[in-house]
Amino acid sequence: MALFRNGNGIAWARRRALVWALFALAFCAAMNIYHYSLQGARGLYLWDKTWLFRILILMGLLPLGLLALSLPLEKIKTKAPSKLLRGFSLVSSFLVSLASLGILAFLIAAPRMGELRKADLNLIDPSIKLESSSRLYDDQEMLLRLSVGSDAHWGTEKTDSNARSNILATIAENKPDLFFLLGDTVETGSSVSQWNAALSDLSAIVPKVPLRPLMGNHDALFGGQYLFKKAFFPEAFSSDSGSPYYYSIETKVATLVALNLPWGTENFDRKQRTWLEEVLKTADPLKPIIVFSHSYFYASGYDDPDLDKPWYDHYQNIPALTPIFERYGVDLVVSGHNHYMEFLEHNEVRYAIVGAMGSKSDPVPAHVSPASKWIAVATFGHVNINITKDYIVVEFKDQLGKTLHEERIRYLPSLESGSNERSPQA
């Protein structure tokens, strides 16, 4: 071996550097593939403007790049430059390998370490038909009463915890048939302590309110999907889609549809699209259809300096999903993600933004959506949706329950003979 090294020292050093560079590349690839497979992670690679997640991909190529640069230098008389680059390649291989394995271990272990507190919540199984109670509203019988909030962001000091608690107390007092939390319940999805803080407050303030949370992009961070399922989707639960992240809920008076859109369409694959179209196509034409998601569709907003894409009128969601909503006559789409409250309308489909459940408000919109009809900025609150036999009544409430804005949507089913598809409302 010594003779081999002495006679072929450069070739041996080159092979050694190559082997370690390939190990580093393999470890880096394994880490990125695992991370990319997690719910919501694809959005980080697409939306992050800091290059952090691009660096996570490219760092695996660094050792090979340094080794490649050393090859032409082997032809010059002085061997020191090529030797130095091979040394840098070896060192970077070790560092990249350690970083990749460390990140991989964190992604696997962090959301699985620690115990979630036992929560006293009235979680709703999406597979079970929702029963509703009746109540008079302006001399009309309310057939279904929903409350909706989003972007509570437990775990960050940027959230107004008093406003969040006030909103929950107002919802508890309203006693809805179902309370939808549309995501970003916590700031960092892999943090057990943040989930426990959320579960503690929810258990204390809305323990008896029927609850159905969706997963937002912050909830999904770094493997947060596992804690989301532990907290809000017990093993005994099931759904018509087979997924805990998107499903429909049948009621006597409405079809409720929850989508998995943490950032945008990164998780809106063929399976979810096919399921969605089938649900909408076969929906009872005598019932209104209400769709819920975390990320928005039409919305006012701004250009966020920390992001690589416009934070308004969603450039992915609009072309991918709004034609489906219009084709099948969806009545109302409710989303969070933007920290405003806003009501919009486009092609006779109504959209509500409700991302104001205590988290720091987004700045005054630099871009006002052409679809916008009303907006409240720097105002905390939630939305109540009351369904009567003729109308969907959408009430935007402030943190103390005062009505800020109200919309009445008359839902008209398709009565075309022989057609199961719904048509847009007149």
Language-model features, listed with the residues they occupy:
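Residue-level marker for buried hydrophobic side chains located in beta-strands
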Residues: 146-148, 179-181, 213, 291, ...
